[in-house]
Every structure is written in structure tokens, then in C-alpha cells.
């Protein structure tokens, strides 16, 4: 019996989709077995996301001008063991899966000493795979960071096209998220794909999302009426 998951993977292959990022947590074990079978490249992402952990240093709210405002947990030593545990769980379970070509530290968790130490542990534990983390980029020059790719999410095609101009940076570039849209969109795929083909340094990207945004549900409101929702 073919499961819905397998049908989704078959559909992706039919449309020349060859890589999956398990945002933002490891997937069910059967997923990796199917990816082995169908030949998908997988970025296996640990269950680590800390959007709400703003620091109390004058950033009690989300501030796009200071992305480090969500870096309290990433920096405070009392959280290091918990962060490392989540990384270890991901690696220990999936290290023998051929489809996994890259580990991802997590998603949008700021950056700090805890993440750097955990990344160093991962590199020592498994030096056969690449390591990914997007949220390090707010720290300025990251050419000496323990990550094997330069990762971004949602830059404009114009800004993205300028990345190879940085002569200090020798790593490949990857869009870990782009073109997140619901309904009749997005309309900028061609612009991004032109950039992908403009330099061998661009590895491609991961659209957010494939199926989930198309699920509609009904829920009962406080007034007793039904309202159709489209969850992100």
C-alpha cells in the first residue's frame, strides 16, 4: 500500500525536486527510508527553534534590526546541555541513513556560544557530512564559522545574486527557505532560478512549503460560527 507520504515524494520527483530540508525538526523514520529509495538529498534538521527567547537587554520585542535579540538561549550556558541533547538525538537516530547529506543545527534560534560548541561537537562526531545553520549570519564576518555552507532565507533575488562578490567567502551558497506563499503564488521563481544558474557557487534552495499550506480546516469560533482557516 502506497502511503500519502510516498505519493508526495513521487510527485516531487516527477517535478524534478531532488532535495528536502526537514524543517524544522527530524521527520518520521519511514520518511528517510523512502528518501533512500527514491534518491532524495536530505538536510536533517534538529528539533531546535527559539523564536520566543528574546534577551532582556533592551530587546523585549522582536526587532529585525537586531536579530541577536532572540539569542538568549543560544548564549546562556544553562541551556547548552538541552541544545546539545537535541542535536545528539537527531544524529544518533539518522547517522546511518544514506539520504542524509547534511545536518542542520535548527531554525531561527539566534547565535551564541552554545550553538558554536554544539556545532563543534557535531563536526567531531561525524566529519563525513556537511553542517548547516542559517542564523549565524547576523554576526558579521562568519568565514571562520564551523558551518560548511552560507545559508540565507528570503533575500531578494537582487541581493542573492551579489553573494559571489564576497572574495573572502569560499563556501557554497544555499537558500534554506524561499518563495513561501499560499494560494496563487509565488511569482518570483524564475528570478531566483536565474540566480541559481548564474554561478556554480549557488547550490539551489528549499521552498517553504510543499503541501501543508494548502490544507484547509473548519473550526468553531467563539460566536458559534464556522470559519475556514489556512494554517501556515
What are these regions (language model features)?
Residues 1-232:
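Extended substrate-binding grooves/exosites of carbohydrate-active enzymes
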Amino acid at each position: 500500500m502506497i502511503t500519502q507520504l510516498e505519493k508526495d515524494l513521487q510527485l516531487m520527483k516527477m517535478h524534478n525536486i531532488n532535495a528536502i530540508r526537514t524543517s524544522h525538526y527530524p521527520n518520521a523514520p519511514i520518511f528517510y527510508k523512502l528518501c533512500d529509495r527514491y534518491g532524495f538529498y536530505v538536510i536533517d534538521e534538529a528539533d531546535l527553534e527559539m523564536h520566543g527567547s528574546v534577551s532582556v537587554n533592551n530587546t523585549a520585542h522582536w526587532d529585525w534590526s537586531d536579530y541577536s535579540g532572540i539569542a538568549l538561549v543560544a548564549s546562556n550556558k544553562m541551556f547548552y546541555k538541552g541544545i546539545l541533547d537535541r542535536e545528539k538525538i537527531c544524529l544518533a537516530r539518522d547517522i546511518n541513513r544514506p539520504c542524509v547529506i547534511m545536518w542542520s543545527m535548527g531554525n531561527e534560534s539566534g547565535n551564541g556560544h552554545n550553538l558554536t560548541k554544539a556545532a563543534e561537537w557535531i563536526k567531531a562526531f561525524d566529519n563525513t557530512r556537511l553542517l548547516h545553520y542559517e542564523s549565524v549570519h547576523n554576526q558579521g564576518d562568519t568565514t571562520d564559522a564551523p558551518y560548511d555552507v552560507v545559508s540565507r532565507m528570503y533575500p531578494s533575488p537582487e541581493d542573492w545574486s551579489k553573494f559571489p562578490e564576497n572574495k573572502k567567502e569560499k563556501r557554497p551558497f544555499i537558500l534554506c527557505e524561499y518563495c513561501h506563499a499560499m494560494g496563487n503564488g509565488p511569482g518570483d521563481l524564475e528570478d531566483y532560478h536565474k540566480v541559481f544558474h548564474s554561478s556554480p557557487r549557488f547550490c539551489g534552495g528549499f521552498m517553504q512549503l510543499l503541501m501543508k499550506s494548502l490544507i484547509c480546516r473548519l473550526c468553531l469560533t467563539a460566536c458559534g460560527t464556522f470559519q475556514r482557516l489556512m494554517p501556515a
